[in-house]
Amino acid sequence: MQGLTERQQQVLHYIRQSISERGYPPTLREIGAHMGIRSTNGVNDHLRALERKGYLTREDMKSRALRPRDLDGAGAGGGADLRGALVNGGNDAPANDQEDDLVEIAVVGRIAAGLPILAEEHVLDTVRIERTLVRGGREVFGLRVTGDSMIEAGIFSGDYIFVRRQLTAQRGDIVVALIGDEATVKYFFPEKDYVRFQPANAAMAPILVRASDFKPAMLLGVVVGVYRKL
């Protein structure tokens, strides 16, 4: 395997230490805070280097999915306890031959008016999932849902939705829209005199925006997938 820089060794040690002490890996922000790296992109650069050199894998569709490779016999095929994987050493690790089949998606905690969707201060983490699971590739971002307005559509508070960025939508699409200063997830129904953002919850009223006040920039994207941590 390729050697590591001092910073890469420090990042890997921190990930292993976190799993050993807490039972799960750190988030990007936790790694950044520990290492004094202000940018999540900077953290990702180190993680990608560790993956490329065979010291780390990131499992699909999981927020805290950093996994040091078990290099002493269990292999990268899974099944080994994470705590065992972090303390074992070794001399070789298989490359990830599915790298080209994955896409990295940023997950944001909130969306605010006047800032880019992927403003660095809003990015919670990144996930890597199969390209076939989301249409739109790098135009897709993840958003953590809060609230119960879409429960009848199977979208619950705490779920992660995948959103394809676009300024248009078809009638009946589930969209993410910026209304006022807050983002909302609703069904999209353009009517003659207004646009109706309809919740999937019989206990909640729709949000009505007059047609004259509606602007395409209010639409941040169309929901193309939902992920729920069990």
Curated annotation (Swiss-Prot):
It holds the Pfam family LexA_DNA_bind. GO terms for biological process: DNA repair; DNA replication; negative regulation of DNA-templated transcription; proteolysis; SOS response. It catalyses: Hydrolysis of Ala-|-Gly bond in repressor LexA. Keywords: Autocatalytic cleavage, DNA damage, DNA repair, DNA replication, DNA-binding, Hydrolase, Repressor, SOS response, Transcription, Transcription regulation. The keyword Transcription regulation applies. The active site is at residues 149, 186. Represses a number of genes involved in the response to DNA damage (SOS response), including recA and lexA. In the presence of single-stranded DNA, RecA interacts with LexA causing an autocatalytic cleavage which disrupts the DNA-binding part of LexA, leading to derepression of the SOS regulon and eventually DNA repair. This is LexA repressor. It comes from Sorangium cellulosum (strain So ce56) (Polyangium cellulosum (strain So ce56)). The lineage of its organism: Bacteria, Pseudomonadati, Myxococcota, Polyangia, Polyangiales.
